[in-house]
Structure formats: C-alpha cells, structure tokens
Amino acid sequence: MCGGAIISDYAPLVTKAKGRKLTAEELWSELDASAADDFWGFYSTSKLHPTNQVNVKEEAVKKEQATEPGKRRKRKNVYRGIRKRPWGKWAAEIRDPRKGVRVWLGTFNTAEEAAMAYDVAAKQIRGDKAKLNFPDLHHPPPPNYTPPPSSPRSTDQPPAKKVCVVSQSESELSQPSFPVECIGFGNGDEFQNLSYGFEPDYDLKQQISSLESFLELDGNTAEQPSQLDESVSEVDMWMLDDVIASYE
C-alpha cells in the first residue's frame, strides 16, 4: 500500500465535512509537523528517548554559565591559610613545600590576626613569590604567633673533618720500645724472665753500661770512662752480638 492510496481513501471524508473535494497537495500542506512525524513513525521514537533533549539543555546552560565573565567561585574564608574553630577562635597554618607538611602557626582572636600570621610565615618560606592576604601592609608578627621551624639547607652542613698528617720522623719517634728478653747465664735461675728495653736514642755506651750492671761487674767501671775499653774486652763478644742482634 502506498501513500497515494491512503490519501485517496482519506479524501472523501474530507469532502463530506467541508462540502468540497481536496487535492493531494492541499492535504499535504495542511498536515503539521507533529502529524507528519506521527505518520512516518518519528514521533513515537522521540517519546522513547526524552532524556536526550534534557541533556542537551543542561549542557547549553553549563556553557552559558562558564562563558559569563566576572563570576568566580566564592571562597569559604575571606583570607588565606585560616579557619574558624567551633568556639569562635581563628587558627592559622601554612604548608611547607620543602617538608611537605602543614605547619601550625597558632590560634588568634580575629581573622585579621590569623591572616597576618599567615603572611609572615609565607614571606619566610616562599619569599617574594608568596601570595599574601595583605600585600600592601608591612606589619610585625601578631601575638601568639609561632614561627615555622627552619629546615636545614645544603649550605648549612658542618665542615668536613680535617685529616691529620704525621711525618715519618714523628711516627718513628712515637713508636713504643719493645723489650728484649735476656737468657739466664750459668745454672742459676735468678736471671730468667728478665727483660731490658733499649730505646732507639740510647747510644752504644749506655747499652754496654747496662749490660755490665746486668752481669754484676764492678760498679766503678761504669762511672770511669777511662776504664770502659778494659771492661769491654772482658765481656764475651758473642753476648754483645746477641744484644745487638736483638736490638736490630
């Protein structure tokens, strides 16, 4: 069945109502847009998805609000870095970017005092880049203000420890003397486990005199330099060699 057949069937009814016969062109012109949509089935589909039109309207409203100049989001507090306590006091705090924590600045009676405390701390932490509540005012810190702790920088490191350099001569003099054990002579046991230390500064004469006293020779020979050569000849040479070898 085509569209022309439907119109031809519909035409006699119209002629009876109005008393004259209408053509197909007149019938098409009299049909409104809603009837045409209903005739071809478009009206029923729009009824099934009414949310599309609502979403389009909401997006249009949002775009208009975004494009309106001069309207900004209203801040909860008038000043930066402050908040009101339930009992009426005003607290001030600031975030330290170097430590990554919020630093407590104190509690104040008014919002202006808390805002000034924030400005002082922001100036110390961020310097000239800080966003202040009162950029045109130069004010001292308010009462009950707790300054933020200063974080150590790389330039404040303690100086490096100095390396102590000791010359070779000083190190040799500072070495302790090692005792030289002497072996007992004869069958007696009174000379065992005796030791005498010979330091590097002793000369040969002092070593010989100490050896003579160890052998219980005449005490006058150690006091008289003229008789030193005679006493040396009386000492066995092998014993003197052992002493010198142990010293080396």
UniProtKB/Swiss-Prot annotation:
Modified positions (Phosphoserine) in chain numbering: 151
On the tree of life, the source organism's domain of life is: Eukaryota
Quote the protein name from its UniProt record: Ethylene-responsive transcription factor RAP2-3
Query: Known SMART domains for this protein?
Result: AP2
Q: Is Cell membrane there in the keyword field?
A: yes
The Basic and acidic residues compositionally biased stretches are 60-70
Tissue expression from the record = Mostly expressed in stems and leaves, and, to a lower extent, in roots, siliques and flowers.
- Describe its partners and assembly state: Interacts with TGA4/OBF4, ACBP2, and ACBP4.
Subcellular location(s) of the protein:
Nucleus; Cytoplasm; Cell membrane
Its GO biological process terms? cell death; ethylene-activated signaling pathway; heat acclimation; positive regulation of DNA-templated transcription; response to cytokinin; response to ethylene; response to jasmonic acid; response to other organism
Task: Specify whether Coiled coil is a keyword of the entry.
Answer: no
Q: Disordered: where is this region? A: 60-79, 132-161
User: Where mainly found?
Assistant: nucleus
